[in-house]
């Protein structure tokens, strides 16, 4: 009877080992995906960060990159701990899983909170940023971001093209008789911003605020979904690890 129980325990341990190994392979790929989403946000979608008053959007992307790297390292460690049957490595693996779980939950919560606050932040700060920093020395990032925003989303001004009348760049005379930046034009040519007409200038209801808000909210949904989704999957990893740890402990007695 004792021999049967021993074989049963050994069989259970082997099953858990292969289950955890399969999980770690999938987990490593998930880490790659998490890191890719973070890098994608930073590298391709960071042009508009200079237009945001809060650094929350940037922080969520950095958290995902860090979490992705740690996930990939943890996945390799998990495979080693599983096949070497080292309980101390399993303990370390569990702790790392817990840390990653918390990081991704934090990223998901930050994305959700910022999602709720985004509209208020843009209404309070975007117009001020555009009219005070556009084409001003030391704010080249804002200038490039505004030009790209207006061209990519076919909008002009924070709320509408009339916002540019309050621009320090326009009022200072440096705009060379322009009433709006050239990036407001449907067909951009040098000096096209001197003529504010519907046939020439983008007239979008809600202005660039609504366009930028929709853009960022879409990416916040991706960041939040990835963070929370992978965190939920990690719960299974922690359960498998605890089961294998307990199984190895029983075999030593």
Swiss-Prot record:
Lipid linkage positions (S-palmitoyl cysteine): 11, 15, 242-243
A Pfam match: Tetraspanin
Q: What is its main location?
A: membrane
Q: Which CDD domains match?
A: CD151_like_LEL
Keywords of this entry: Cell membrane, Glycoprotein, Lipoprotein, Membrane, Palmitate, Transmembrane, Transmembrane helix, Ubl conjugation
Highest rank taxon of the organism: Eukaryota
Q: Give the GO molecular function terms.
A: integrin binding
Name its cellular compartments: Cell membrane
Q: What is this protein called?
A: CD151 antigen
What is the species listed in this Swiss-Prot or TrEMBL entry? Rattus norvegicus (Rat)
> How does the protein associate with the membrane?
Multi-pass membrane protein
A GO biological-process term: positive regulation of endocytosis
Q: What is the recorded post-translational modification?
A: Palmitoylated. Palmitoylation by ZDHHC2 regulates CD151 expression, association with other tetraspanin family proteins and function in cell adhesion.
